[in-house]
Amino acid sequence: MILMNPKTSKILWLLGFLSLLSSFSLEIAAQTTQNINVLFINEVDNEPAAKAVEVVLTYLKKNIRYGLSVQLDSIEANKSDAKVLLEAICNKYATSIEKKQTPHLILDTTKSGIASETVKSFTQALGLPTISASYGQQGDLRQWRDLDEAKQKYLLQVMPPADIIPEAIRSIVIHMNITNAAILYDDSFVMDHKYKSLLQNIQTRHVITAIAKDGKREREEQIEKLRNLDINNFFILGTLQSIRMVLESVKPAYFERNFAWHAITQNEGEISSQRDNATIMFMKPMAYTQYRDRLGLLRTTYNLNEEPQLSSAFYFDLALRSFLTIKEMLQSGAWPKDMEYLNCDDFQGGNTPQRNLDLRDYFTKITEPTSYGTFDLVTQSTQPFNGHSFMKFEMDINVLQIRGGSSVNSKSIGKWISGLNSELIVKDEEQMKNLTADTVYRIFTVVQAPFIMRDETAPKGYKGYCIDLINEIAAIVHFDYTIQEVEDGKFGNMDENGQWNGIVKKLMDKQADIGLGSMSVMAEREIVIDFTVPYYDLVGITIMMQRPSSPSSLFKFLTVLETNVWLCILAAYFFTSFLMWIFDRWSPYSYQNNREKYKDDEEKREFNLKECLWFCMTSLTPQGGGEAPKNLSGRLVAATWWLFGFIIIASYTANLAAFLTVSRLDTPVESLDDLAKQYKILYAPLNGSSAMTYFERMSNIEQMFYEIWKDLSLNDSLTAVERSKLAVWDYPVSDKYTKMWQAMQEAKLPATLDEAVARVRNSTAATGFAFLGDATDIRYLQLTNCDLQVVGEEFSRKPYAIAVQQGSHLKDQFNNAILTLLNKRQLEKLKEKWWKNDEALAKCDKPEDQSDGISIQNIGGVFIVIFVGIGMACITLVFEYWWYRYRKNPRIIDVAEANAERSNAADHPGKLVDGVILGHSGEKFEKSKAALRPRFNQYPATFKPRF
């Protein structure tokens, strides 16, 4: 017998009581514990889901307060063979039926693709209550589309965080107005179903592609290909390791201001990279403060450490919530007692068991605390649950600057709360703008004044109507651009093999974003590229020719006759004048030799040499020469001169009139028909231009109609009646364009506009050339050059528009901008600037018209003749006055001097000394007086010498 200490006995009694109490509690708990059967289907590589479900089971065992025991059967689903997976599921399900352990719930954590759709098909066909964490929004789960109302209550889907996080890209694109984007993702995200829905109804050109896994070189090539698609906004969805690999594969030049990089991850760490200079936007999840303690407990106590924490916490909370939902339904009596379970082999396509099971209602009402974020579940029965339910959490937005291979600065500038169409919450808008890539578009153009002209002093090296237009559009749409000329100088034409050149080819090859210039909208171009609304009026083809001009001359009247003719006329004038003087001097019947005979005539005209010159000159004028010589021989000479002068004057007058009017009477080419009918002037458009295409196609169309006519006319199978009906159709098809196209080919099409202008300017009367081209180009050349003119009316009119890539978002943006400028009359101001106020416009003389009179440029020489004649007369007057005033006059002598001189005259008869005639008396003296008298008649009476 053992004696106990009373104190020891008391302790033993207390321990026994506690043991009994514990056993009683366990027995009570065992009686209230709810057992449920769950079939867990998970993909092979979805470790966070597998680990989370395992932790849930441990968590429930250690927390008996839940009163829940889960009998879990697991299936690892392969992602490539639906048949194998379906057999595995059916076998597991059949076994549970045999054991009478049919699953209350199918917990599906397959992600997407074959595995997910196989599970959805299985559960939908057999009517099994399912809670799925598969990826996809409404309509993405093909096997769960168009569910009836009953199935919508027990086939539920909650989107995992990795399916919600890509929606942040949509929010960023909208907030920052991004027009292009490349989205690279790794295996931690599933994007197959996001291609159409992610940026739907947003004017953002984007590419979604998986990150190249082969190596750094492959990733570099991948990024280079994306750059060739003219993308400068990059989004990286992946683990921190994947983000680092991509960043280290990027060329340093791609971190400049015209590029933007965004890294988005499910992990909570920091980015490490060997980049020397990079600034990126970094988004990572951030647990709500109120849940951090619970998450820490799960990580430390229950070993919920699988990365990423966000996914692990989601799967944990989803599994726990799902199990508690089944428990609540079972204990509340909401679970049907006569659940029918159909084996896979018994399913015949339309015998799915009918369920009266509202799993959705109980699932949304569970109030169990979460470990990372709350569940945002659709509670309204009228709204779809699947594709709209998810876990709500925050993503922190950071500006991350990497210098020298490490993050030197990380600043939080906002946050994004997970959701569909959730907006960014930005704290620092200025920093957010700095993360935006400068939108720079590549423009290719063709120099064509006044639309595009080179100017080294201009900001972009070019000026013109289109440069001003694109600058106005850029101010509205907010972008920058680079501009360069296309190598071949062509807007774009398609050859016989369907190959394009010029700007069109650049746009098709994605080497250009915008085609700018005087580019016509053509049907075949619209097949491969897009055009904006027209920014200019309809422009057709017209004709440019050299302006006809006759050289003007002040002495035009002298050019009527050639120099040799003028010299001959002058020689005839002097010869006739000299001959008339000789005849008058030697003819015994002339006035000077018969003064007594003609002393009573009113006209006493002595034809000395001076008088003969005057007579012949005045005879050529309407005034006439005056009195003719008295002798017959002189009159014959005068008559001959008059006849000669009449013929010369008549010929001169006729030629002068012809010279002044013939240039204005030439019939010019006034239309395309006139050009086609003549053969003197060659004509052609630019090689490869739209005008060339027009004439070539018109020629081909005429040829096609000719072939049709020929086939009908020469068809021997036609009956006489049928042939008679075609009798009126002899040859109604015009060959106008066929002949014109042949003439153009013979004339050789110019390669450039400068060559065409040079050929027009070098045109002569024998080898003329006319250029056919766009009316705007030709009209501008006319405005800037006085030797060119526009001929005829425009034809084949087409609008000018800006070209963009087919399907480009720029089309709608530019359309809105152009319409805005049109409403503001800004386009009219540009026309005014470049067509009326341009400094390059030439000030040309008014072209001559047939109704205009003779210009001063051609007749002004006669006024010069008048002024020269009047000037010579004035000079002669001065000389006469001088001669009269300062010549040596005869002196007056007295009688004594006269007597002395008379004595001297005897020795020198007939000599004039100091105005006195020295002579002698008698017959000889009288004869001397008679001979010298005419000589002194020219002196005034006061100064006549004394005899």
Curated annotation (Swiss-Prot):
It is a multi-pass membrane protein. GO terms for biological process: detection of chemical stimulus involved in sensory perception; detection of chemical stimulus involved in sensory perception of smell; entrainment of circadian clock; modulation of chemical synaptic transmission; rhythmic process; synaptic transmission, glutamatergic; temperature compensation of the circadian clock; transmission of nerve impulse. The chain crosses the membrane at residues 563-583, 642-662, 859-879. Residues 1-30 form the signal peptide. Glycans are attached at N78, N177, N277, N434, N687, N715, N762. Residues 584-641, 880-947 are cytoplasmic. It is found in: Cell membrane; Cell projection, Axon; Cell projection, Dendrite; Perikaryon. InterPro entries: Glu/Gly-bd, Iono_Glu_rcpt_met, Ionotropic_Glu_rcpt, Iontro_rcpt_C, K_chnl_dom, Peripla_BP_I. SUPFAM superfamilies: Periplasmic binding protein-like I, Periplasmic binding protein-like II, Voltage-gated potassium channels. Keywords: Behavior, Biological rhythms, Cell membrane, Cell projection, Glycoprotein, Ion channel, Ion transport, Ligand-gated ion channel, Membrane, Olfaction, Receptor, Sensory transduction, Signal, Transmembrane, Transmembrane helix, Transport. Disruption phenotype: No visible phenotype. Viable and fertile but their response to environmental cues such as temperature, humidity and odorants is impaired. Response of ac4 coeloconic sensilla neurons to agonist phenylethylamine and of ac2 sensilla neurons to agonist 1,4-diaminobutane is abolished. Response of dorsal organ cool cells to changes in temperature is abolished and consequently larvae fail to avoid cool temperatures. Response of sacculus neurons to changes in humidity is also abolished and consequently larvae fail to move towards their preferred humidity. GO terms for cellular component: axon; cilium; membrane; perikaryon; plasma membrane; sensory dendrite; synapse. In the antenna, detected in neurons of the arista and also detected in sacculus neurons which innervate the first and second chambers (at protein level). Throughout the main body of the antenna, expressed in neurons which innervate the coeloconic class of olfactory sensilla (at protein level). Expressed in multiple cells of the dorsal organ including the dorsal organ cool cells (at protein level). Detected in femur and retina. Expressed in a subset of femur chordonotal neurons and antennal Johnston's Organ neurons. Residues 31-562, 663-858 are extracellular. GO terms for molecular function: coreceptor activity; glutamate receptor activity; ligand-gated monoatomic ion channel activity; transmitter-gated monoatomic ion channel activity involved in regulation of postsynaptic membrane potential. Interacts with nocte. PANTHER family: IONOTROPIC GLUTAMATE RECEPTOR (PTHR18966). Belongs to the glutamate-gated ion channel (TC 1.A.10.1) family. Integral part of various neural sensory systems in the antenna that provide the neural basis for the response to environmental changes in temperature (thermosensation), humidity (hygrosensation) and odor detection. Required for odor-evoked electrophysiological responses in multiple neuron classes in the antenna and is likely to function as part of an olfactory receptor complex with Ir76a and Ir76b. Together with Ir21a and Ir93a, mediates the response of the larval dorsal organ cool cells, a trio of cool-responsive neurons, to cooling and is required for cool avoidance behavior. This is Ionotropic receptor 25a. It comes from Drosophila melanogaster. The gene is Ir25a.
